[in-house]
Protein backbone atom coordinates (compact mmCIF):
# COMPACT_ATOMS: atom_id res chain seq x y z
CA UNK A 1 0.00 0.00 0.00
CA UNK A 2 1.19 3.56 -0.66
CA UNK A 3 2.26 5.63 2.34
CA UNK A 4 2.54 9.22 3.46
CA UNK A 5 4.14 10.72 6.56
CA UNK A 6 2.07 12.39 9.28
CA UNK A 7 3.94 14.03 12.16
CA UNK A 8 6.93 11.79 11.54
CA UNK A 9 4.93 8.55 11.32
CA UNK A 10 4.36 6.61 8.10
CA UNK A 11 0.66 6.03 7.36
CA UNK A 12 -0.61 3.52 4.81
CA UNK A 13 -3.61 4.60 2.77
CA UNK A 14 -5.95 3.25 0.15
CA UNK A 15 -6.71 4.97 -3.13
CA UNK A 16 -9.23 7.77 -2.62
CA UNK A 17 -8.68 8.13 1.11
CA UNK A 18 -8.13 11.52 2.65
CA UNK A 19 -5.42 12.30 5.19
CA UNK A 20 -8.11 12.39 7.90
CA UNK A 21 -9.56 9.00 6.96
CA UNK A 22 -6.18 7.29 6.83
CA UNK A 23 -5.15 8.80 10.18
CA UNK A 24 -8.47 7.85 11.81
CA UNK A 25 -8.12 4.27 10.58
CA UNK A 26 -4.69 4.13 12.26
CA UNK A 27 -6.11 5.47 15.53
CA UNK A 28 -4.55 8.94 15.15
CA UNK A 29 -6.83 11.87 15.90
CA UNK A 30 -6.46 15.07 13.97
CA UNK A 31 -8.61 17.67 15.79
CA UNK A 32 -11.95 18.15 14.03
CA UNK A 33 -15.57 19.11 14.55
CA UNK A 34 -17.48 18.72 11.30
CA UNK A 35 -15.86 15.54 9.98
CA UNK A 36 -17.48 12.19 10.79
CA UNK A 37 -16.43 8.85 9.29
CA UNK A 38 -20.02 7.99 8.38
CA UNK A 39 -20.96 11.30 6.76
CA UNK A 40 -20.02 13.32 3.71
CA UNK A 41 -17.23 15.89 3.93
CA UNK A 42 -18.24 19.45 4.82
CA UNK A 43 -14.81 20.96 5.61
CA UNK A 44 -16.42 23.95 7.28
CA UNK A 45 -15.06 23.92 10.84
CA UNK A 46 -11.39 24.41 9.78
CA UNK A 47 -10.17 22.76 12.96
CA UNK A 48 -8.39 20.00 11.01
CA UNK A 49 -6.06 22.32 9.08
CA UNK A 50 -2.68 20.72 8.44
CA UNK A 51 0.57 21.86 6.88
CA UNK A 52 1.72 20.00 3.76
CA UNK A 53 5.50 20.17 3.87
CA UNK A 54 5.97 18.30 0.61
CA UNK A 55 3.52 16.89 -1.88
CA UNK A 56 0.20 18.45 -2.82
CA UNK A 57 0.83 21.96 -1.56
CA UNK A 58 -1.43 24.90 -2.26
CA UNK A 59 0.31 28.24 -2.61
CA UNK A 60 -0.99 31.25 -0.70
CA UNK A 61 0.17 34.75 -1.70
CA UNK A 62 1.85 36.85 0.97
CA UNK A 63 4.14 39.80 1.44
CA UNK A 64 7.58 38.78 2.70
CA UNK A 65 10.28 41.15 3.82
CA UNK A 66 13.29 41.15 1.48
CA UNK A 67 16.32 42.15 3.56
CA UNK A 68 18.42 42.86 0.46
CA UNK A 69 15.85 45.31 -0.89
CA UNK A 70 14.77 46.51 2.52
CA UNK A 71 11.10 46.23 1.63
CA UNK A 72 8.17 43.80 1.48
CA UNK A 73 7.83 41.95 -1.81
CA UNK A 74 5.12 39.59 -3.17
CA UNK A 75 5.80 35.96 -2.30
CA UNK A 76 3.99 32.69 -1.63
CA UNK A 77 3.90 30.12 1.15
CA UNK A 78 2.19 26.72 1.54
CA UNK A 79 -1.45 27.15 2.50
CA UNK A 80 -2.88 25.16 5.40
CA UNK A 81 -5.39 22.62 4.11
CA UNK A 82 -8.26 20.74 5.81
CA UNK A 83 -7.18 17.14 6.42
CA UNK A 84 -10.75 15.92 5.94
CA UNK A 85 -10.69 17.11 2.33
CA UNK A 86 -7.01 16.62 1.49
CA UNK A 87 -6.45 13.52 -0.63
CA UNK A 88 -3.56 11.39 0.62
CA UNK A 89 -0.69 11.01 -1.85
CA UNK A 90 2.41 8.86 -1.99
CA UNK A 91 5.40 10.34 -0.14
CA UNK A 92 3.38 13.34 1.06
CA UNK A 93 4.74 14.85 4.29
CA UNK A 94 2.09 16.39 6.55
CA UNK A 95 2.26 18.10 9.93
CA UNK A 96 -0.72 18.52 12.23
CA UNK A 97 1.30 19.78 15.18
CA UNK A 98 3.75 22.45 14.00
CA UNK A 99 3.55 26.01 15.30
CA UNK A 100 1.63 27.33 12.30
CA UNK A 101 -1.02 24.63 12.67
CA UNK A 102 -1.27 25.19 16.42
CA UNK A 103 -1.80 28.91 15.86
CA UNK A 104 -4.56 28.17 13.35
CA UNK A 105 -6.25 25.72 15.73
CA UNK A 106 -6.11 28.24 18.57
CA UNK A 107 -7.63 30.87 16.28
CA UNK A 108 -10.48 28.55 15.26
CA UNK A 109 -11.14 27.77 18.91
CA UNK A 110 -11.16 31.43 19.90
CA UNK A 111 -13.51 32.24 17.05
CA UNK A 112 -15.94 29.46 18.02
CA UNK A 113 -15.93 30.56 21.66
CA UNK A 114 -16.46 34.29 21.02
CA UNK A 115 -20.22 34.01 21.48
CA UNK A 116 -20.39 30.60 23.10
CA UNK A 117 -22.17 30.63 26.48
CA UNK A 118 -20.30 29.34 29.51
CA UNK A 119 -22.97 26.70 30.16
CA UNK A 120 -20.56 23.90 31.08
CA UNK A 121 -21.88 23.46 34.66
CA UNK A 122 -25.39 22.72 33.36
CA UNK A 123 -24.61 21.34 29.89
CA UNK A 124 -25.22 17.62 29.32
CA UNK A 125 -22.25 17.47 26.95
CA UNK A 126 -19.81 18.44 29.71
CA UNK A 127 -17.23 15.73 30.11
CA UNK A 128 -17.45 14.55 26.50
CA UNK A 129 -17.47 17.92 24.72
CA UNK A 130 -14.89 18.49 22.01
CA UNK A 131 -15.13 22.23 22.51
CA UNK A 132 -14.01 21.76 26.12
CA UNK A 133 -11.29 19.26 25.24
CA UNK A 134 -9.84 21.31 22.40
CA UNK A 135 -9.89 24.49 24.49
CA UNK A 136 -7.43 22.94 26.92
CA UNK A 137 -5.41 21.22 24.18
CA UNK A 138 -5.26 23.92 21.52
CA UNK A 139 -6.21 27.28 22.97
CA UNK A 140 -6.11 27.77 26.71
CA UNK A 141 -6.35 31.56 26.41
CA UNK A 142 -9.00 34.10 27.31
CA UNK A 143 -11.15 35.45 24.50
CA UNK A 144 -10.39 39.00 23.48
CA UNK A 145 -13.96 40.07 22.75
CA UNK A 146 -15.30 42.29 25.52
CA UNK A 147 -18.69 43.20 24.04
CA UNK A 148 -21.99 41.47 24.72
CA UNK A 149 -22.11 38.07 22.97
CA UNK A 150 -24.67 37.39 20.26
CA UNK A 151 -27.80 35.81 21.71
CA UNK A 152 -29.82 33.14 19.91
CA UNK A 153 -32.80 30.88 20.69
CA UNK A 154 -32.33 28.40 23.55
CA UNK A 155 -34.36 25.37 24.61
CA UNK A 156 -36.02 24.97 21.20
CA UNK A 157 -37.95 21.69 20.97
CA UNK A 158 -37.20 20.29 17.54
CA UNK A 159 -39.52 17.34 18.15
CA UNK A 160 -40.45 14.71 20.72
CA UNK A 161 -36.83 13.67 21.37
CA UNK A 162 -34.46 16.61 20.71
CA UNK A 163 -33.90 20.06 22.27
CA UNK A 164 -31.78 22.65 20.41
CA UNK A 165 -29.66 25.44 21.89
CA UNK A 166 -28.55 27.77 19.09
CA UNK A 167 -26.07 29.66 21.28
CA UNK A 168 -24.05 26.48 21.81
CA UNK A 169 -24.16 25.48 18.14
CA UNK A 170 -20.89 25.68 16.17
CA UNK A 171 -22.60 25.03 12.80
CA UNK A 172 -20.67 21.86 12.01
CA UNK A 173 -23.78 20.65 10.07
CA UNK A 174 -23.41 17.06 11.27
CA UNK A 175 -27.06 16.95 12.32
CA UNK A 176 -28.19 18.15 8.89
CA UNK A 177 -26.10 15.49 7.18
CA UNK A 178 -27.39 12.73 9.48
CA UNK A 179 -30.94 13.60 8.50
CA UNK A 180 -30.09 13.86 4.81
CA UNK A 181 -27.74 10.91 4.46
CA UNK A 182 -28.75 8.42 7.15
CA UNK A 183 -32.45 9.04 7.80
CA UNK A 184 -33.07 10.21 4.20
CA UNK A 185 -35.23 13.05 5.50
CA UNK A 186 -34.24 16.65 4.78
CA UNK A 187 -35.87 18.11 7.86
CA UNK A 188 -32.98 20.28 9.13
CA UNK A 189 -31.11 23.13 7.46
CA UNK A 190 -29.39 26.36 8.45
CA UNK A 191 -30.31 29.98 7.95
CA UNK A 192 -28.62 33.39 8.21
CA UNK A 193 -24.86 33.92 7.95
CA UNK A 194 -21.87 34.55 10.17
CA UNK A 195 -22.61 34.78 13.87
CA UNK A 196 -26.36 34.82 13.13
CA UNK A 197 -26.24 31.24 11.78
CA UNK A 198 -28.57 28.70 13.35
CA UNK A 199 -30.10 25.30 12.59
CA UNK A 200 -33.80 25.36 11.70
CA UNK A 201 -36.58 22.93 10.90
CA UNK A 202 -38.16 22.65 7.49
CA UNK A 203 -41.40 24.71 7.41
CA UNK A 204 -44.29 22.84 8.98
CA UNK A 205 -42.07 19.96 10.11
CA UNK A 206 -40.85 18.40 13.34
CA UNK A 207 -37.74 16.33 13.84
CA UNK A 208 -39.68 13.09 14.11
CA UNK A 209 -38.13 10.45 11.85
CA UNK A 210 -36.80 7.13 13.21
CA UNK A 211 -33.20 8.34 13.68
CA UNK A 212 -33.61 11.65 15.51
CA UNK A 213 -31.36 10.64 18.42
CA UNK A 214 -28.47 10.27 15.99
CA UNK A 215 -28.47 14.06 15.58
CA UNK A 216 -27.71 14.37 19.30
CA UNK A 217 -25.22 11.51 19.14
CA UNK A 218 -23.07 13.16 16.44
CA UNK A 219 -23.27 16.69 17.87
CA UNK A 220 -19.73 17.49 19.09
CA UNK A 221 -20.97 20.10 21.56
CA UNK A 222 -24.10 20.57 23.68
CA UNK A 223 -26.26 22.20 21.03
CA UNK A 224 -28.53 19.17 20.62
CA UNK A 225 -29.61 17.28 23.71
CA UNK A 226 -31.89 14.31 24.15
CA UNK A 227 -35.06 14.84 26.15
CA UNK A 228 -34.55 11.38 27.63
CA UNK A 229 -30.99 11.92 28.97
CA UNK A 230 -31.20 15.67 29.58
CA UNK A 231 -30.16 16.68 33.14
CA UNK A 232 -30.20 13.07 34.41
CA UNK A 233 -26.54 12.12 34.87
CA UNK A 234 -22.98 13.37 34.59
CA UNK A 235 -21.02 11.31 32.12
CA UNK A 236 -17.92 11.11 34.30
CA UNK A 237 -19.92 9.04 36.80
CA UNK A 238 -20.97 6.56 34.11
CA UNK A 239 -19.28 3.32 33.14
CA UNK A 240 -19.82 1.54 29.84
CA UNK A 241 -20.32 -2.08 28.80
CA UNK A 242 -20.54 -3.59 25.33
CA UNK A 243 -24.03 -4.68 24.37
CA UNK A 244 -26.23 -5.67 21.45
CA UNK A 245 -29.55 -3.94 20.81
CA UNK A 246 -32.61 -6.08 21.58
CA UNK A 247 -34.96 -3.99 19.46
CA UNK A 248 -34.89 -6.07 16.28
CA UNK A 249 -32.99 -8.72 14.34
CA UNK A 250 -30.39 -6.27 13.00
CA UNK A 251 -28.45 -6.51 16.26
CA UNK A 252 -26.92 -3.04 16.35
CA UNK A 253 -23.84 -2.91 18.57
CA UNK A 254 -24.18 -0.68 21.61
CA UNK A 255 -22.37 1.00 24.45
CA UNK A 256 -24.50 0.57 27.58
CA UNK A 257 -23.82 3.53 29.89
CA UNK A 258 -24.68 2.94 33.53
CA UNK A 259 -23.93 4.36 36.97
CA UNK A 260 -22.32 1.68 39.18
CA UNK A 261 -23.29 3.64 42.29
CA UNK A 262 -27.02 3.03 41.87
CA UNK A 263 -27.01 0.17 39.35
CA UNK A 264 -29.04 2.15 36.83
CA UNK A 265 -28.72 2.29 33.04
CA UNK A 266 -28.98 5.84 31.69
CA UNK A 267 -28.56 5.52 27.96
CA UNK A 268 -27.44 3.44 24.99
CA UNK A 269 -25.05 4.68 22.32
CA UNK A 270 -24.20 3.04 18.99
CA UNK A 271 -20.94 1.10 18.94
CA UNK A 272 -19.18 1.16 15.58
CA UNK A 273 -19.48 -2.04 13.55
CA UNK A 274 -19.02 -1.78 9.79
CA UNK A 275 -20.73 -5.14 9.17
CA UNK A 276 -23.89 -4.42 11.15
CA UNK A 277 -24.86 -0.86 12.01
CA UNK A 278 -21.82 1.17 10.95
CA UNK A 279 -22.10 4.16 13.35
CA UNK A 280 -25.87 4.36 13.84
CA UNK A 281 -28.95 3.17 15.72
CA UNK A 282 -32.65 3.94 15.43
CA UNK A 283 -34.55 5.77 18.17
CA UNK A 284 -36.50 2.68 19.26
CA UNK A 285 -33.27 0.76 19.65
CA UNK A 286 -31.70 3.58 21.67
CA UNK A 287 -34.63 3.43 24.08
CA UNK A 288 -34.74 -0.34 24.65
CA UNK A 289 -32.80 0.12 27.90
CA UNK A 290 -35.95 1.59 29.52
CA UNK A 291 -37.50 -1.90 29.60
CA UNK A 292 -34.77 -3.18 31.92
CA UNK A 293 -36.26 -2.08 35.24
CA UNK A 294 -39.88 -1.81 34.11
CA UNK A 295 -42.34 -4.57 35.11
CA UNK A 296 -39.60 -6.83 36.47
CA UNK A 297 -40.49 -10.14 38.09
CA UNK A 298 -38.48 -10.23 41.31
CA UNK A 299 -40.00 -13.17 43.22
CA UNK A 300 -41.04 -16.69 42.19
CA UNK A 301 -44.81 -17.17 42.34
CA UNK A 302 -47.20 -20.11 42.25
CA UNK A 303 -50.89 -20.17 41.44
CA UNK A 304 -52.94 -18.00 39.13
CA UNK A 305 -54.97 -14.83 39.41
CA UNK A 306 -55.94 -13.90 42.96
CA UNK A 307 -54.50 -17.19 44.23
CA UNK A 308 -50.99 -16.36 42.97
CA UNK A 309 -48.58 -16.08 45.90
CA UNK A 310 -44.81 -15.49 46.17
CA UNK A 311 -42.62 -18.40 47.27
CA UNK A 312 -38.92 -19.15 47.61
CA UNK A 313 -36.93 -20.24 44.58
CA UNK A 314 -36.37 -23.75 45.93
CA UNK A 315 -40.09 -24.27 46.47
CA UNK A 316 -40.87 -22.90 43.01
CA UNK A 317 -38.34 -25.22 41.35
CA UNK A 318 -39.70 -28.24 43.21
CA UNK A 319 -43.30 -27.45 42.27
CA UNK A 320 -42.28 -26.78 38.66
CA UNK A 321 -40.52 -30.16 38.52
CA UNK A 322 -43.54 -31.87 40.07
CA UNK A 323 -45.93 -30.35 37.52
CA UNK A 324 -43.66 -31.15 34.56
CA UNK A 325 -43.05 -34.72 35.74
CA UNK A 326 -46.80 -35.25 35.81
CA UNK A 327 -46.97 -34.68 32.03
CA UNK A 328 -45.99 -37.31 29.48
CA UNK A 329 -42.97 -36.11 27.48
CA UNK A 330 -44.90 -36.52 24.23
CA UNK A 331 -47.43 -33.98 25.48
CA UNK A 332 -44.96 -31.50 26.95
CA UNK A 333 -44.35 -28.26 25.03
CA UNK A 334 -41.00 -26.48 25.35
CA UNK A 335 -41.21 -22.80 24.37
CA UNK A 336 -37.95 -21.09 23.45
CA UNK A 337 -37.59 -17.30 23.33
CA UNK A 338 -36.53 -15.01 20.47
CA UNK A 339 -35.71 -12.40 23.12
CA UNK A 340 -33.28 -14.49 25.17
CA UNK A 341 -29.66 -15.30 24.41
CA UNK A 342 -28.62 -18.27 22.33
CA UNK A 343 -27.05 -19.75 25.47
CA UNK A 344 -30.36 -19.61 27.36
CA UNK A 345 -32.18 -21.22 24.45
CA UNK A 346 -29.55 -23.92 24.12
CA UNK A 347 -29.88 -24.82 27.80
CA UNK A 348 -33.64 -25.16 27.34
CA UNK A 349 -33.16 -27.24 24.19
CA UNK A 350 -30.82 -29.54 26.11
CA UNK A 351 -33.45 -29.96 28.82
CA UNK A 352 -36.07 -30.77 26.18
CA UNK A 353 -33.79 -33.44 24.73
CA UNK A 354 -33.08 -34.88 28.18
CA UNK A 355 -36.82 -35.12 28.88
CA UNK A 356 -37.56 -36.59 25.46
CA UNK A 357 -39.89 -33.69 24.65
CA UNK A 358 -39.88 -32.91 20.93
CA UNK A 359 -42.69 -30.35 20.92
CA UNK A 360 -40.58 -27.21 20.37
CA UNK A 361 -42.11 -23.76 20.00
CA UNK A 362 -40.88 -20.16 19.80
CA UNK A 363 -42.30 -17.17 21.67
CA UNK A 364 -41.67 -13.98 19.71
CA UNK A 365 -42.94 -10.45 19.32
CA UNK A 366 -44.88 -9.63 16.16
CA UNK A 367 -43.55 -7.60 13.26
CA UNK A 368 -42.96 -3.86 13.53
CA UNK A 369 -42.11 -1.09 11.08
CA UNK A 370 -38.81 -1.92 9.41
CA UNK A 371 -36.93 0.12 6.83
CA UNK A 372 -34.08 -0.19 4.34
CA UNK A 373 -31.63 1.62 6.64
CA UNK A 374 -31.20 -0.44 9.83
CA UNK A 375 -34.55 -1.57 11.18
CA UNK A 376 -35.37 -5.22 10.49
CA UNK A 377 -38.99 -6.29 10.00
CA UNK A 378 -38.33 -8.92 12.68
CA UNK A 379 -38.91 -7.27 16.07
CA UNK A 380 -36.88 -9.97 17.86
CA UNK A 381 -33.11 -9.92 18.42
CA UNK A 382 -32.49 -13.68 18.44
CA UNK A 383 -34.93 -15.68 16.34
CA UNK A 384 -31.96 -17.06 14.41
CA UNK A 385 -30.11 -17.92 17.62
CA UNK A 386 -33.07 -19.88 18.99
CA UNK A 387 -33.20 -21.84 15.74
CA UNK A 388 -29.46 -22.46 15.95
CA UNK A 389 -29.88 -23.78 19.50
CA UNK A 390 -32.13 -26.58 18.21
CA UNK A 391 -29.80 -27.36 15.29
CA UNK A 392 -32.14 -25.92 12.70
CA UNK A 393 -35.28 -27.76 13.84
CA UNK A 394 -38.38 -25.86 12.74
CA UNK A 395 -39.89 -24.16 15.77
CA UNK A 396 -43.66 -23.94 15.87
CA UNK A 397 -45.44 -20.71 16.81
CA UNK A 398 -47.44 -19.80 19.89
CA UNK A 399 -50.72 -20.01 17.90
CA UNK A 400 -49.70 -23.59 17.05
CA UNK A 401 -49.17 -24.20 20.77
CA UNK A 402 -52.61 -22.86 21.63
CA UNK A 403 -54.23 -25.04 18.99
CA UNK A 404 -52.43 -28.11 20.35
CA UNK A 405 -53.52 -27.26 23.90
CA UNK A 406 -57.13 -27.05 22.77
CA UNK A 407 -56.87 -30.38 20.93
CA UNK A 408 -55.28 -32.09 23.94
CA UNK A 409 -51.98 -32.75 22.17
CA UNK A 410 -50.22 -30.52 24.72
CA UNK A 411 -50.90 -30.93 28.44
CA UNK A 412 -47.91 -29.14 29.97
CA UNK A 413 -45.70 -26.17 29.06
CA UNK A 414 -42.21 -24.98 30.01
CA UNK A 415 -41.69 -21.51 28.55
CA UNK A 416 -38.76 -19.10 28.46
CA UNK A 417 -39.26 -15.34 28.29
CA UNK A 418 -42.14 -12.90 28.51
CA UNK A 419 -42.45 -11.65 24.94
CA UNK A 420 -45.19 -12.95 22.68
CA UNK A 421 -47.37 -11.29 20.09
CA UNK A 422 -50.45 -12.58 21.90
CA UNK A 423 -52.42 -11.03 24.76
CA UNK A 424 -53.42 -12.82 27.96
CA UNK A 425 -56.94 -13.26 26.55
CA UNK A 426 -55.48 -14.97 23.48
CA UNK A 427 -53.41 -17.24 25.75
CA UNK A 428 -56.51 -18.32 27.70
CA UNK A 429 -56.15 -22.01 26.66
CA UNK A 430 -52.92 -22.18 28.70
CA UNK A 431 -54.85 -21.34 31.87
CA UNK A 432 -56.73 -24.63 31.53
CA UNK A 433 -53.49 -26.60 32.05
CA UNK A 434 -52.28 -27.56 35.52
CA UNK A 435 -48.61 -27.33 34.61
CA UNK A 436 -47.41 -24.16 32.87
CA UNK A 437 -43.95 -23.10 34.05
CA UNK A 438 -42.62 -19.69 33.02
CA UNK A 439 -38.97 -18.63 33.32
CA UNK A 440 -39.05 -14.89 32.79
CA UNK A 441 -37.33 -11.62 33.62
CA UNK A 442 -40.46 -9.49 33.20
CA UNK A 443 -44.18 -9.82 33.64
CA UNK A 444 -46.23 -10.31 30.50
CA UNK A 445 -49.04 -12.31 28.94
CA UNK A 446 -47.17 -15.62 28.95
CA UNK A 447 -46.04 -15.42 32.61
CA UNK A 448 -49.54 -14.29 33.60
CA UNK A 449 -50.95 -17.55 32.20
CA UNK A 450 -48.43 -19.69 34.10
CA UNK A 451 -49.03 -21.79 37.20
CA UNK A 452 -45.41 -21.32 38.29
CA UNK A 453 -43.26 -18.29 37.45
CA UNK A 454 -39.54 -18.18 38.23
CA UNK A 455 -37.61 -14.93 37.70
CA UNK A 456 -34.42 -15.00 35.62
CA UNK A 457 -31.85 -12.35 34.77
CA UNK A 458 -32.47 -9.75 32.09
CA UNK A 459 -30.27 -9.37 29.00
CA UNK A 460 -28.41 -6.43 30.58
CA UNK A 461 -27.46 -8.68 33.52
CA UNK A 462 -25.82 -11.59 31.70
CA UNK A 463 -23.04 -12.45 29.30
CA UNK A 464 -24.43 -14.00 26.16
CA UNK A 465 -24.83 -13.81 22.41
CA UNK A 466 -27.43 -13.19 19.73
CA UNK A 467 -27.48 -14.29 16.09
CA UNK A 468 -28.76 -11.48 13.88
CA UNK A 469 -30.76 -11.59 10.66
CA UNK A 470 -27.57 -11.96 8.62
CA UNK A 471 -26.49 -14.99 10.65
CA UNK A 472 -23.74 -13.10 12.48
CA UNK A 473 -23.15 -14.21 16.09
CA UNK A 474 -22.51 -11.25 18.39
CA UNK A 475 -21.59 -11.38 22.05
CA UNK A 476 -22.65 -8.94 24.75
CA UNK A 477 -21.44 -8.26 28.29
CA UNK A 478 -23.29 -8.15 31.57
CA UNK A 479 -23.80 -4.49 32.44
CA UNK A 480 -25.33 -4.87 35.90
CA UNK A 481 -25.68 -7.60 38.49
CA UNK A 482 -29.14 -9.20 38.61
CA UNK A 483 -31.35 -8.59 41.66
CA UNK A 484 -30.55 -10.70 44.71
CA UNK A 485 -31.42 -14.37 44.29
CA UNK A 486 -31.96 -14.17 40.52
CA UNK A 487 -29.77 -16.21 38.16
CA UNK A 488 -29.21 -16.25 34.39
CA UNK A 489 -31.87 -18.33 32.64
CA UNK A 490 -29.38 -21.02 31.62
CA UNK A 491 -28.41 -21.49 35.29
CA UNK A 492 -32.05 -21.67 36.41
CA UNK A 493 -32.75 -24.22 33.66
CA UNK A 494 -29.80 -26.28 34.89
CA UNK A 495 -31.17 -26.12 38.46
CA UNK A 496 -34.61 -27.19 37.22
CA UNK A 497 -33.02 -30.07 35.33
CA UNK A 498 -31.45 -31.21 38.59
CA UNK A 499 -34.89 -31.27 40.23
CA UNK A 500 -36.10 -33.36 37.28
CA UNK A 501 -33.20 -35.78 37.73
CA UNK A 502 -31.45 -34.75 34.50
CA UNK A 503 -27.84 -33.77 33.84
CA UNK A 504 -27.50 -31.30 30.97
CA UNK A 505 -23.77 -31.81 30.60
CA UNK A 506 -22.51 -28.35 31.55
CA UNK A 507 -21.55 -26.65 34.78
CA UNK A 508 -20.83 -23.11 33.62
CA UNK A 509 -21.26 -20.75 30.69
CA UNK A 510 -18.06 -21.91 29.02
CA UNK A 511 -19.23 -25.51 29.07
CA UNK A 512 -22.61 -24.49 27.69
CA UNK A 513 -21.00 -22.53 24.87
CA UNK A 514 -19.17 -25.65 23.75
CA UNK A 515 -22.65 -26.98 23.07
CA UNK A 516 -23.22 -24.05 20.72
CA UNK A 517 -20.24 -25.18 18.65
CA UNK A 518 -21.68 -28.68 18.54
CA UNK A 519 -25.14 -27.35 17.60
CA UNK A 520 -23.70 -25.19 14.80
CA UNK A 521 -21.78 -28.16 13.41
CA UNK A 522 -24.90 -30.34 13.57
CA UNK A 523 -26.89 -27.71 11.64
CA UNK A 524 -24.40 -27.67 8.75
Task: Set out the residue ranges of the language-model regions.
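Short beta-alpha connecting loops at secondary-structure transitions
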Residues: 3-5, 90-96, 199-204, 240, ...
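Short, structural beta-strand-to-alpha-helix junction motif
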Residues: 4, 18-21, 341, 488
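Conserved short loop/turn motifs at secondary-structure junctions
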Residues: 10, 33-38, 165-168, 200-206, ...
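A basic, amphipathic helix-loop patch mediating RNA/tRNA/ribosome contacts
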Residues: 19-53
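Fe-S ferredoxin-like electron-transfer domains
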Residues: 46-246, 250-254
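Phosphate/diphosphate-binding loops
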Residues: 62-64, 68, 209-270, 417-420, ...
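Cofactor-/ligand-binding subdomain signature composed of acidic, glycine-rich
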Residues: 146, 154, 259-330, 374-380, ...
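Non-catalytic alpha/beta scaffold blocks inside enzyme catalytic domains
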Residues: 327, 344-345, 351, 355-523
Amino acid sequence: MPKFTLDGKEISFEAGETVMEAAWREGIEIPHYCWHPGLSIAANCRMCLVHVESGRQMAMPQLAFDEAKGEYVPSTKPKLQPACQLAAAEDMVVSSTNDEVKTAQASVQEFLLLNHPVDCPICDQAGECKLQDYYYEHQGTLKRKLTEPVHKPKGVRFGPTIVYDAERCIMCTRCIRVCDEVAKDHVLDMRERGNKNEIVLAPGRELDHKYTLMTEHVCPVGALTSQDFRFKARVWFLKSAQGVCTGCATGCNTHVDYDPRNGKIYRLRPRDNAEVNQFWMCDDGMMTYTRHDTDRLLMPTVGRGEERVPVGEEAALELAAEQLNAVDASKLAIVLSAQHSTEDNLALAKLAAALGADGLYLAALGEWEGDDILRSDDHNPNRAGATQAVSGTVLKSVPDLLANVQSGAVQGVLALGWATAETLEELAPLVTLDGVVSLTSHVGALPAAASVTIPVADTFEVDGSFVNAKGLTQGFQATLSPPAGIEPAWKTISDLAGKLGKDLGFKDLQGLRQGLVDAAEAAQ
